[in-house]
Amino acid sequence: GVKEKSNVIETDSTHPITDYSKFKLNCEKILLSYKNKNFCPFIVRPATVCGYSRRQRLDLIVNILTNFAFHKKVINVFGGDQLRPNIHIKDMIRVYEFFIKEDLDKMSGDIVNAGIENNSVNELAEIVKKNIDNKIEIKRVPTDDNRSYHISSKKLIKDYNFQFNHTISDAVNDLKNAFDTGKLKNTFNDDKFFNVKLMQNINLI
């Protein structure tokens, strides 16, 4: 939900706004309630993932901005002051690989945030512009979407000694390369890149 404090940590109160976040929180509570010597639940709360992947999504903030910048030569920013923490897809994978090998007794029942860059949407647009083409136009549009939050991954870094290796700029350039080499085509009209459309097509929603 919307948070005013400078860094949101794992023990802060939760106030989910969307059904998606409400269901995720409910799942956390259910999993943690089953903790025992034979079941070691561990919760990762990732920031928004960005970058190129084989099951590509183009409905996430950095990927949306990069898609528009590369193909339309314009970036539409709705609002702009909202903070959006992100994590590169390669670091997200590394987090999961890391904890598969971690000590279960240490992990059991724990919760960690996973995200390294807390930028405003305006800042994200500027990062994309810098890496795609400085001539790209950024259009700012008013919005009533005031979701804004700034997460801290200090626990992941300090308690578990995890280090992030990839940046938002890396994600933008990975996508740029995928567009350049034809790995991603029809990026505005192919429903497979957009989760809501994909789920609608198979009657999940």
Language-model segments: what does each one mean?
Residues V2-I43, T48-V49, R54:
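Catalytic helix-loop patch of NAD(P)-dependent Rossmann-fold dehydrogenases
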Residues N26, I30, Y34, L65, ...:
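Hydrophobic alpha-helix immediately C-terminal to the catalytic Tyr-X-X-X-Lys motif of short-chain
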Residues N38-V44, G51-N76, N86-I87, D91:
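Oxidoreductase cofactor-interface core, primarily capturing Rossmann-like NAD(P)-dependent enzymes
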Residues K72-K73, V77-I205:
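C-terminal substrate-binding subdomain of Rossmann-fold SDR/epimerase-dehydratase oxidoreductases
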Residues N7-T11, D59-I61, R94, N131:
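Glycine-rich, phosphate-binding/catalytic loops in enzymes
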